[in-house]
Curated annotation (Swiss-Prot):
<dbReference type="GO" id="GO:0046933">
    <property type="term" value="F:proton-transporting ATP synthase activity, rotational mechanism"/>
</dbReference>
<dbReference type="InterPro" id="IPR034679">
    <property type="entry name" value="ATP_synth_b"/>
</dbReference>
<dbReference type="GO" id="GO:0045259">
    <property type="term" value="C:proton-transporting ATP synthase complex"/>
</dbReference>
<comment type="similarity">
    <text>Belongs to the ATPase B chain family.</text>
</comment>
<comment type="subunit">
    <text>F-type ATPases have 2 components, F(1) - the catalytic core - and F(0) - the membrane proton channel. F(1) has five subunits: alpha(3), beta(3), gamma(1), delta(1), epsilon(1). F(0) has four main subunits: a(1), b(1), b'(1) and c(10-14). The alpha and beta chains form an alternating ring which encloses part of the gamma chain. F(1) is attached to F(0) by a central stalk formed by the gamma and epsilon chains, while a peripheral stalk is formed by the delta, b and b' chains.</text>
</comment>
<keyword id="KW-0150">Chloroplast</keyword>
<dbReference type="Pfam" id="PF00430">
    <property type="entry name" value="ATP-synt_B"/>
</dbReference>
<keyword id="KW-0813">Transport</keyword>
<keyword id="KW-0812">Transmembrane</keyword>
<keyword id="KW-0406">Ion transport</keyword>
<dbReference type="GO" id="GO:0046961">
    <property type="term" value="F:proton-transporting ATPase activity, rotational mechanism"/>
</dbReference>
<comment type="function">
    <text>F(1)F(0) ATP synthase produces ATP from ADP in the presence of a proton or sodium gradient. F-type ATPases consist of two structural domains, F(1) containing the extramembraneous catalytic core and F(0) containing the membrane proton channel, linked together by a central stalk and a peripheral stalk. During catalysis, ATP synthesis in the catalytic domain of F(1) is coupled via a rotary mechanism of the central stalk subunits to proton translocation.</text>
</comment>
<keyword id="KW-0472">Membrane</keyword>
<keyword id="KW-0375">Hydrogen ion transport</keyword>
<feature type="transmembrane region" description="Helical">
    <location>
        <begin position="18"/>
        <end position="38"/>
    </location>
</feature>
<dbReference type="GO" id="GO:0009535">
    <property type="term" value="C:chloroplast thylakoid membrane"/>
</dbReference>
<comment type="function">
    <text>Component of the F(0) channel, it forms part of the peripheral stalk, linking F(1) to F(0). The b'-subunit is a diverged and duplicated form of b found in plants and photosynthetic bacteria.</text>
</comment>
Amino acid sequence: MTNSLFLLAEGGLFDFNATLPLMVLQILLLMVVLNAIFYTPIARVLDERDEYIRKNLTQASETLAKAEAITKQYEQDLAKERRDAQMIIASSQQEAQEIVAMEIKQAQKDTELLVNEATTQLNSQKEKALQALEKQVNTLSEQIKNKLLSGQLAG
């Protein structure tokens, strides 16, 4: 019966002998070696990469914030310049309308003066013509009167 128990223990799941602690030592030694050779450099590279990415993300965020601030400032400046340009255009149009109105008034005054001068000249020429006609009428009347009187005296 002791033989049968011993046989059962040998063929069991675990054999409790000197190989089990050796296996544990091999696994621990493998973990230490892998940690020193493989995991530590990989962890360092991953940490460096993580730091690099974090640093670049921070710089990108700062650059993006600056770009947005500059864009906003440019948009504000552009809007202000557009308003100023529209005000300048409106004032220029107003000035142009005032200048045109003044020139139209001046042209109307000049036209009135020309019409008045022409009317005055025409009236003056009319008066001269009437005076000349009146002299001719008077002269002709005198001649007719003289002929009539001389015809009556002769006849």
